[in-house]
Amino acid sequence: VPDRYYGLIVIVVALVIFLGCIVSPPSLMDDVDAVQAQIARNMLESGDWVTPRLDGVVYLEKPPLKYWLIALCYLAFGVHDWAARIPVALGAVLLCWLTYQFGCWAESRRAGFYAGLALATCVGLFIFTRVLIADILVTLTITASIYGYMRAIEGREEESRRWALLGAAAMG
């Protein structure tokens, strides 16, 4: 396989693994999953996208990004278990692609390819796409910020600004 297709292969493998798993059981039976999904549903139904609530009580234990993404998926696809898992699954796919990019930059396309595939086939990452825990999204944003800042340090001035902006945007 020509090395120019490595990034595409990593994305396709990650999509098959992570998007394929969102439609299969189990449903949102765990307490944590149900709470996260219900908070997003409450946001959608109430129209209050600023303050997460559970049973009318303000729920500020977690950052709202995950709830916003789940609520947007509910808006687009309806309120379903699989729709609640889409943001985490897409976050995992993006994390695999970003790992590929990081490896390409740091070493070579082949190294990036193996790094992206290794992450895509990692059991731990797969398990985290099955539950609604924000760890994958946090890992994605931290990795993107580190990648952006690393690229900013070694780039030309114009490129450095763009990479630094990526790093800053990923940090929130």
Model-derived regions: residue spans:
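Membrane-integral, polyisoprenol-dependent glycosyltransferases
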Residues: 1-172
